[in-house]
Amino acid sequence: MPPTLLLVRHAQALHNATQDWSIHDPKLTELGEQQSRELHESLKASKIGNEVELIVVSPMRRTLQTATIGLDWMIKKGTKVMLDANWQENADKPCDTGNKISVMEAEFPQYDFSTVDPSYPDKTTNLSSNPYAFTEKAILARGQTCLKALYDRPEKVIAVVSHSGFLRTAVCNRMFFNADWRVFTFDEDAMAKSAEKKFILKESEETEKKGGGMGRSDVGVFGITENDFPPEVQDQMKDEEAKGPAKAEELDEVNKQKPT
């Protein structure tokens, strides 16, 4: 039987508070640290929180900090932590781009970074084949990659600490307030009817009606909007695919020269 998923959004980070998207891989604010402590209390008091057998975390700074503070009690009792670049945020702005693995290993020596894709945090080269590219095609595929990997896991309950944009557009079509959490199961009936054989989640009635486990998130279904993915990137990817490797390399060089 596939696992139940406890999906968590990271707590408030500097870019959330300042609306400054130029901050590279921002850390949590003081409020974010407090939200993480509240997450700790909320999950520890819940039945599902005490059933978690695996923790999957995006290797970005804000998600690692949220897990370190909010899920510390799970970690201290021996729950395995697995870092996975597939759960990183969508965009290629500095705030949504991670640091080199060597940098993060020095900051978070308690975690094993050997499971992180060596190409992380690159999102801008070879757009047509880069699994982390900021394109609708790549992000939706990445969401399915994440769900397939968890569907096949032996654990009964898995917690994931990720990002609002990725969770909403590619995983579960829900909004998450900072440090809030929701519970999902795999919707086997919907999956069986899916012509594309997609992995589809169904939210628990409790967190759906409440607006997250802490009741801080918007209620409802929220899909992809026209502003989620830049049209110029989508057009550029099509251009790469149409004109072949030589054109792709040329476009990569142009990307590197663009201001961020």
Where are these regions (language model features)?
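Generic beta-sheet signal
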Residues: L5, E53, K156-S162
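Active-site-proximal alpha-helix that buttresses catalytic centers in soluble enzyme cores
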Residues: P2-T79, E105
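Acidic, low-complexity terminal tails and accessory targeting/binding regions
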Residues: M1-T4, S46, A91-Q110, R168-T260
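A short, acidic, amphipathic alpha-helical segment used as a generic capping/interface helix at domain edges
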Residues: I139-R153
